[in-house]
């Protein structure tokens, strides 16, 4: 789709606008220049001054170069270029302004080449307003001048302005080049990622395809990254699949796209393809971070260990983002002690490293330990970020540390100047709600200074599910249905609450509403790794004939556990059925299928690790406790909220999840 009404083109009028101070350069005397016997009047002096300035710039002696500049009336373009580059890398804004003033006084400000360099200089110094002014005063705007401004504005986060200027540039007939498309594609995600920005990105995709840039590896890689940031995995995959040439950056972009958008299997598959197909280049640190993220998502411990070994062999174990990703990977694979050892061996730590460790302890339910690490982080001089508080407040929630969580929430703004965001309020509502302090949770939502979003109302509805508060659940669900009419999970959660309260007419009403809106319940799915291979299991009401062995094993196992005291918990079944039929349904839950497969295919004493995409239900939680006791198995289950470590009939969550 193309713009039906392109922006109106206003032909610029040019006026002399002085945005720099008009004071002549009167620097202190330069002993280097004045004492140089080669400097004398005439052409020889000009050559010597230019050469001296260039030499000083190359040596990083900007102050001295500027002093010599005051003695030179006609610096060459190369001299100005080196001065501008030196200013961008080493100077204060005042030095840059002095060089710019000399260019203006010398009448060289309309040189498009120097204008391009000046815009880049001001961008590097973080002075985007000066960059705009240089652009506005430049009459002959080549594509390089436009690109320089696009780069400056994109880096400064002014994506909307870049896109507006891009359409204007097209209207006046300036041809884009490969750098133009790179900058404007990045501009699409420089601000908030909205549907409007996505549509503009698709239009730019069409433009560059028509103009023959669809085979350029760098542009296509940027396009993959743009679609990834919008969550358009299929578009990104299509672009990547059509690339005739791929480099390590393009492979890394596609792997990151899958890893960040919940496609961990595809991320690992793409990494394997990369290792087979790339001969001239090896995966870099960016690749490793994304692959480790995929391993963490699936709790693929054995594959994560292989990646760790590769990182060590490649010497990437000194790069902070890689080490932080390793800490997270081991934590989310249930090997908290290994993640701690990796962290302890770090020579340098940044806030991301600390956040990784805090989050790892939090997801295992060790709230007190997470708080201890948080305080250790502060003692080491690291400043917390909003992500830090999400991690530590989440840790408090999983262990029920209400007062500690409230204290930390209060310190965010008071001690650290961090304004609580929606995510922090959602953590607090979850903390209070899990502790059955639903009135406090509801009051916090009511007193919020910003509009509560789906995360906050979702936390409240989840708490109502735990404690069976129908009235508050109805209030929260009404807001969620308005905010997220297409999120089937909210309808299912309300139906669960009604089912546990035996309110079957209301269950039917919610199910009809779900069907009327064309929504489907997200099926429960589990993953597990056995001998370095990943297996996936989906909840079904009717058993798959291909899983007859697992089915038969489960039926026998359930009968054995019943003899030992196991009573199936069927309150959450959304059907008004006979007890036997309900038991058959809960026996088909994905975590039970994965558990049975693990019992069949692992040796005695070998732990079973399962990852689930939803909250662990009460029946599966109880069933797994019985299995861990009577089958003498250690079983680790990571659901959407936290880790459950089952051993000898006891769960590490203390039945608080």
UniProtKB/Swiss-Prot annotation:
Tell me the null mutant phenotype: Abolished chloroplast NADH dehydrogenase-like (NDH) complex-dependent cyclic electron transport (CET) around photosystem I (PSI). The double mutant crr2 kea3 enhances the kea3 single mutant phenotypes, and delays induction of CO(2) fixation after overnight dark adaptation.
GO CC terms in record: chloroplast
Point out the signal peptide segment: none
Q: Cross-referenced InterPro entries, in alphabetical order?
A: DYW_dom, E_motif, Pentatricopeptide_rpt, PPR_At4g14850-like_plant, TPR-like_helical_dom_sf
Q: Where is the transit peptide?
A: 1-51
- Keyword Repeat, does the record have it? yes
NCBIfam families given for it? PPR (TIGR00756)
Entry similarity comment: Belongs to the PPR family. PCMP-H subfamily.
Q: Where are the PPR repeats?
A: 45-75, 76-110, 111-141, 142-176, 177-215, 216-246, 247-277, 284-318, 319-349, 350-384, 385-420, 421-451
Q: Which cell locations does it reside in?
A: Plastid, Chloroplast
UniProt keyword list: Chloroplast, Plastid, Repeat, Transit peptide
Q: Name one GO biological process term.
A: RNA modification
Protein name, as recorded: Pentatricopeptide repeat-containing protein CRR2, chloroplastic
* Role according to the record: Required for the intergenic processing between chloroplast rsp7 and ndhB transcripts. Necessary for chloroplast NADH dehydrogenase-like (NDH) complex-dependent cyclic electron transport around PSI (CET).
Which organism encodes this protein?
Answer: Arabidopsis thaliana
Q: Which gene holds the coding sequence for this protein?
A: CRR2
* Annotated GO MF terms: RNA binding; zinc ion binding
* Type E(+) motif: annotated span: 532-562
Q: Where is this region: Type DYW motif?
A: 563-657
